[in-house]
């Protein structure tokens, strides 16, 4: 990909540039979810619902918390590098690249060790059923032993996307998915390692993707190049990255904590409900990967145009992206609800678990379009450096409100009364984020 092609984000037809960038991210997210889903399908069908709950229940929420935090922080690198790239500031691009990589290495090592040490305590705190504790601890510990690979890949992919390269992260995820599927079949079906086999397969696949993205950055000559000897934290760049990334990281933590609290309530309904929730989280991800791809696309688009000083493209690009995100959200809701029984049947063959999953989908799926407002507007605001208020809206309007709802309802509520916290908090967050976005854009464009 040449420099001229990358600059199409600041010069080309807006809807085309958004879609050119969007589709590789979407397909990449699909393959990333594919190897996670393959774990769940193979474990659920060939090991059992208890093993499925061990892989995707409380263990999955813990993993999401840590990985989500770092992914949030990595958006700081995406925004900073995209702005420098749009402004054609080569020295700043190089410094921010090496700072981001150093942060990924240190973060992966420190949090990986912490996860291994504290896995039992975290799972017990989440009211994980006693019969699931041993395998859940095993899965979490193996996963966290390779956390550094996950951090390296996520940061490297974020850097490539920041400069407009969304294709190579896709290619690496395809390779990673193939490796994971082959190892799943080997370590679960041929060598019956159960949950351990699923964890090892994921770890090795993530290591492969980390190596591939690192080699790409080392030998990339257009725009930037990673030199291992220059990996260090430049204070100025670290401050800039963390100024944007930390609020996003804490936002991700709040999402995860609120989801963990929901998971604790789900656990109280028993193993069948836990298995249904795990399966639903895999089906539900179809929406999240599409929505997230729009969020990443608008963040990179706005970031580069912000660096280039093209304010009208920022406004028009955000509107176009929102329209596409809303159409996609409604379409996904209709498709998932039309095929709900078939989709749950892919993961489990227990009729009771399938019925519980259908109840979950009928509550949550109709409200997907609400989150499109939150994803697109927060991405556009973050790309312009406006992170504090948008993060507070998410943390309070969605996460804190969700925790309060579940805490008040969980003791005596039905399953539907617990999980309706998602549509309620999305509605509150969408309204608040839309109001703030309109207010902030008026101020920015009046000042310009």
Where do the PLM segments sit?
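Short alpha-helical transmembrane segments in multi-pass integral membrane proteins
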Residues: 1-22, 81-146, 190-246, 302-367, ...
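Residue-level signal for short hydrophobic patches within transmembrane helices
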Residues: 11, 15-34, 38, 62-69, ...
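Transmembrane helical elements of multi-pass membrane transporters/channels
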Residues: 20-39, 142, 153, 176, ...
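Transmembrane alpha-helix boundary and packing residues in multipass membrane permease domains
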Residues: 25, 29, 41, 79, ...
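Helix-terminus/linker motif at the lipid-water interface of multi-pass membrane proteins
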Residues: 34-53, 123-130, 186-195, 253-282, ...
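Small-residue hotspots at the loop-to-helix junctions and early N-terminal turns
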Residues: 47-61, 136, 140, 199, ...
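Small-residue-rich hydrophobic transmembrane alpha-helices
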Residues: 52-113, 150-169, 276-340, 371-394
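Short runs within selected transmembrane alpha-helices of multi-pass transporters and secretion channels
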Residues: 74, 142-161, 169-177, 198-213, ...
């Amino acid at each position: 990909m040449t420099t001229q092609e990358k600059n199409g984000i600041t010069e080309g037809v807006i809807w085309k540039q958004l879609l050119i960038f969007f589709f590789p991210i979407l397909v990449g997210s699909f393959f990333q979810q594919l190897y996670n889903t393959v774990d769940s399908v193979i474990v659920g069908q060939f090991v059992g619902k208890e093993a499925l709950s061990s892989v995707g229940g409380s263990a999955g929420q813990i993993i999401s918390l840590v990985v989500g935090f770092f992914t949030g922080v990595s958006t700081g690198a995406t925004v900073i590098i995209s702005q420098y790239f749009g402004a054609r500031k080569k020295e700043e691009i190089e410094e921010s690249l090496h700072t981001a990589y150093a942060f990924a290495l240190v973060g992966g090592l420190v949090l990986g060790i912490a996860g291994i040490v504290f896995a039992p305590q975290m799972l017990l705190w989440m009211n994980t059923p006693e019969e699931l504790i041993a395998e859940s601890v095993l899965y979490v510990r193996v996963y966290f032993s390779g956390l550094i690979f996950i951090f390296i890949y996520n940061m490297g992919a974020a850097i490539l996307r920041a400069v407009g390269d969304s294709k190579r992260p896709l290619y690496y995820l395809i390779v990673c998915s193939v490796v994971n599927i082959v190892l799943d079949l080997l370590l679960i079906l041929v060598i019956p390692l159960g949950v351990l086999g699923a964890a090892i397969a994921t770890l090795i696949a993530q290591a492969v993707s980390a190596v591939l993205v690192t080699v790409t950055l080392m030998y990339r000559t257009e725009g930037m190049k990673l030199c291992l000897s220059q990996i260090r934290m430049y204070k100025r760049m670290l401050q800039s990255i963390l100024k944007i990334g930390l609020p996003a990281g804490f936002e991700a933590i709040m999402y995860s904590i609120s989801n963990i609290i929901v998971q604790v309530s789900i656990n109280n309904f028993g193993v069948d409900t836990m298995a249904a929730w795990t399966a639903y989280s895999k089906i539900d991800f179809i929406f999240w990967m599409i929505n997230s791809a729009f969020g990443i696309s608008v963040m990179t688009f706005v970031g580069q145009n912000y660096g280039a000083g093209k304010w009208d493209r920022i406004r028009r690009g955000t509107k176009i992206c929102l329209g596409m995100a809303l159409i996609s959200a409604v379409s996904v809701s209709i498709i998932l609800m039309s095929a709900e029984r078939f989709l749950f049947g892919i993961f489990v063959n227990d009729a009771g678990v399938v019925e519980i999953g259908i109840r979950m989908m009928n509550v949550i799926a109709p409200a997907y379009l609400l989150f499109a407002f939150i994803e697109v507007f927060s991405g556009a605001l973050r790309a312009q450096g406006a992170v504090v208020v948008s993060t507070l809206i998410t943390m309070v309007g969605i996460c804190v409100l969700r925790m309060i709802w579940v805490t008040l309802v969980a003791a005596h509520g039905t399953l539907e009364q617990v999980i309706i916290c998602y549509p309620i908090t999305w509605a509150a967050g969408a309204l608040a984020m839309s109001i703030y976005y309109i207010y902030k854009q008026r101020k920015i464009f009046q000042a310009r």
